[in-house]
Amino acid sequence: ILASNADVIIIDPEREYSALVKALGGEIINISATSPSHINAMDMNKEYGDGANPVILKSEFIMSLCEQLIGGNNLGAKQKSIIDRCTASVYRTYQQNDYTGTVPTLQDFRAELLKQDEPEAKEIALAIELFTHGSLNTFAKQTNVDTNNRLICYDILDLGKQLMPIGMLVVLDSILNRITQN
């Protein structure tokens, strides 16, 4: 790693790489319900999706995330339409500002769901409340870690059973964001 320009991204389920990453000046991102480190599940850069409309691809991700947040059940057509509409709405200002400024969060997304008239929107908002305003809201806040370091270690040891599927989705999406930037 020291002799190349390559970026190295590690997903560490057993906390085996922390000492090495620290010694090499990398960023260790501890992910858990109680960690002060946060990755915004809705982070998105201009290149997200490799040339396609980033919001369309992010909407697909948010649908997958909502499926996990709701309990792994498949979303119906109405729910998908509502999620797609709300995703486009919360990203509108960010997109109009050429993907600069404050990135929306899952809290913004939930607030947008609550503005909708359909009862299904209220149901989705209630189902994701634990992950936006409750004790498992670690992915509903602005990112406060350096995801641009050449060496990143996502430490997922303390993620826990409830957050593991969601955490893996968010970590992989964060990595996609990083890869498409390059």
Regions found by a protein language model. Give the residues of each.
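Glycine-rich phosphate-binding P-loop
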Residues: 1
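Hydrophobic multi-pass inner-membrane translocation pores used for secretion
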Residues: 5, 29-31
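Conserved RecA-like ASCE P-loop NTPase motor core of nucleic-acid helicases/translocases
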Residues: 7-11
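P-loop NTPase motor domains
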Residues: 15-26, 33-35, 40-182
